C-alpha cells in the first residue's frame, strides 16, 4: 500500500510538472495592430493573413505570419503592396488565400469604393509560395461593382467538397456568393444560372466565413459596427452551400474586462482532426482608437448536436501544438 501511494504521489508530481511547462500562445498572437485575420494550414505550417490596421491611406500592404506550433510566429513583411497592383491605392483589406495547382492566390479588397463609378473592389494576387511576393493576377479587379447591394469587400474563398471554388463576400449588410472559374480569371454562372446570388442571413454586416463539418455548411459572419464594442461573430447552419441560412446566434463577443469589438474572424481546422480554432481581432481595454486592433486565437468546440459552443475570449490563447 505504501508503494502504491508513493507511485500516485510521483504521478501527480509528473503531471503537475508537465502542466506547468505547457506553453500557451498568449493573446495577442504577435505584436502590432492587425485585423480581419484569415488563418489556414499549408504543408504543416500555420499561416495568418491579416489586414494592416491603420488609417485607410496607410493600408497599402499586407504582412503575413507563420508558425509551426501556434506560439512562435514569424512575420513576413509586405507580401503584397499597392506597388504590385496598379489600380489599388489604399484600404487593402481582408486577404483570403487559396492554393491551386502549385500557386497561391490572394484575394483582397482595395480602395473602399462607395459606388460603381469608382475604381476598386476585389482583386487577386498570385505567388509561388504563401509568403509571396504576390503580383497582380488579373491587372484589374475581379469584382468592381455593387451587386444586390453588397459592397465588394471582405472576400472569402471557399472550396466545396467537390473541389469547386466560390467567393463569398460583401459589406453594407449584404452578402453574395459567386462561382469562380477553374483558372480564377473570372466568375461563371451558379447552378441556378445567376452570377451573383445573395445569401444574406439575419443580422449580417460583413466578414463572411464558411466551412463544412459532418456534411453541414457552417456560415459565419460579423455583426455590429467594427469601430464599436458591439462587434461580434454569429453563425448559421444549412444543408446547402447557398442556404437558406437561418441565424443560430452569437458565438464570439466582447468581454469588458479583456477587450471589445471581437469580430471579423476565420476558423482553422487541424487537418485530419476535429480540432478547431477561431482566429479574430479585438480592441484591448483602454484603447479607443478604432484602428487599435490585435489578432487573437481561441479554441472552438461543438456540442453533441453540432452547434458551436460560445467562445470566451482570453489572454492565454491556446496551448502549443503542431499542425501535422
Language-model-derived ranges and their functions:
Residues 6-16:
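Bacterial N-terminal signal peptides
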Residues 18-324:
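Carbohydrate-active catalytic/glycan-binding domains of CAZyme proteins
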Residues 1-4:
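Positively charged n-region of N-terminal signal peptides that target proteins for export
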Amino acid at each position: 500500500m505504501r508503494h502504491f501511494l508513493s507511485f500516485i504521489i510521483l504521478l501527480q508530481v509528473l503531471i503537475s510538472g508537465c502542466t506547468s511547462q505547457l506553453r500557451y500562445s498568449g493573446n495577442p498572437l504577435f505584436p502590432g495592430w492587425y485585423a480581419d485575420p484569415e488563418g489556414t494550414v499549408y504543408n504543416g505550417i500555420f499561416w495568418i493573413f491579416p489586414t494592416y490596421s491603420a488609417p485607410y491611406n496607410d493600408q497599402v500592404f499586407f504582412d503575413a505570419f507563420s508558425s509551426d506550433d501556434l506560439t512562435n510566429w514569424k512575420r513576413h513583411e509586405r507580401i503584397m503592396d499597392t506597388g504590385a497592383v496598379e489600380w489599388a491605392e489604399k484600404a487593402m483589406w481582408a486577404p483570403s488565400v487559396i492554393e491551386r495547382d502549385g500557386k497561391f492566390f490572394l484575394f483582397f479588397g482595395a480602395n473602399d469604393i462607395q459606388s460603381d463609378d469608382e475604381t476598386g473592389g476585389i482583386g487577386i494576387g498570385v505567388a509561388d509560395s504563401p509568403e509571396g511576393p504576390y503580383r497582380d493576377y488579373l491587372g484589374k479587379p475581379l469584382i468592381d461593382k455593387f451587386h444586390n447591394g453588397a459592397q465588394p469587400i471582405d472576400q472569402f474563398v471557399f472550396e466545396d467538397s467537390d473541389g469547386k471554388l466560390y467567393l463569398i463576400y460583401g459589406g453594407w449588410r449584404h452578402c453574395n456568393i459567386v462561382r469562380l472559374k477553374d483558372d480564377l480569371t473570372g466568375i461563371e454562372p451558379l447552378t441556378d444560372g445567376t452570377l451573383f446570388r445573395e445569401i444574406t442571413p439575419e443580422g449580417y454586416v460583413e466578414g463572411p466565413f464558411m466551412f463544412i463539418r459532418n456534411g453541414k455548411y457552417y456560415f459565419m459572419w460579423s455583426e455590429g459596427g467594427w469601430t464599436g464594442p458591439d462587434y461580434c461573430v454569429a453563425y448559421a447552419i444549412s444543408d446547402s452551400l447557398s442556404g437558406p441560412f437561418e441565424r443560430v446566434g452569437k458565438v464570439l463577443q466582447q468581454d469588458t474586462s479583456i477587450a471589445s469589438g471581437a469580430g471579423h474572424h476565420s476558423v482553422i481546422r487541424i487537418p485530419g482532426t476535429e480540432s478547431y480554432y477561431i482566429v479574430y481581432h479585438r480592441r484591448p481595454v483602454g484603447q479607443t482608437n478604432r484602428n487599435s486592433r490585435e489578432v487573437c486565437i481561441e479554441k472552438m468546440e461543438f456540442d453533441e448536436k453540432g452547434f458551436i459552443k460560445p467562445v470566451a475570449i482570453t489572454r492565454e490563447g491556446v496551448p502549443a501544438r503542431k499542425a501535422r
